[in-house]
Amino acid sequence: GLEHAEFFRYGVMHRNTFVDAPHVLDATFGVPGTDVRLAGQITGTEGYMEAVATGLLAALNTYAEAIDAVPLSLPRTGALGALVAYATDPETVGYQPMHVNFGLVPPLDDGNRRSKRDRYQAYADRAHAELDAYLGSRSELFPSRA
């Protein structure tokens, strides 16, 4: 299929253009002093699911603002909460684009040694429990959970 292809240049990776999110965005992915929210690759969050998730979070926070509700601040123990914290924490140094990964999630503090599989399951169990409790406390945004 590529026998007649002409290559313009070899060895060039794609180039990401992204804002210095920790210094220009608030925790809702908003640009302070404006009505603008950003999401996806431009914020330095990489990946298709990360783009969808940050877009949904930006939309939910826009809705929260419209109904005069407190913005969502997801627990850092979950994938999206940890990614948002990394992307919007002004203390982040040398900001670079990032996928969701377990390195962003706070460690388990129970002192138990686990296999990788069991550790990841413990991360998931903790994240699910904290997210469920948090969303249950936000009935103004999620009335069906009340």
Give names to the regions the model predicted.
Residues 1-45, 52-53, 72-90, 95-99, ...:
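A glycine-rich dinucleotide-binding beta-alpha-beta segment and adjacent secondary-structure elements
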Residues 48, 61-68, 85, 89-93, ...:
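Short, well-ordered loop/turn and helix-capping segments at boundaries between secondary-structure elements
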Residues 52-74:
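Internal hydrophobic alpha-helix adjacent to the cofactor/substrate pocket in enzyme cavities
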Residues 53-60, 84, 128-132:
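Predominant activation on well-ordered alpha-helical scaffold segments within soluble catalytic domains
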Residues 97-146:
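C-terminal auxiliary extensions adjacent to catalytic cores
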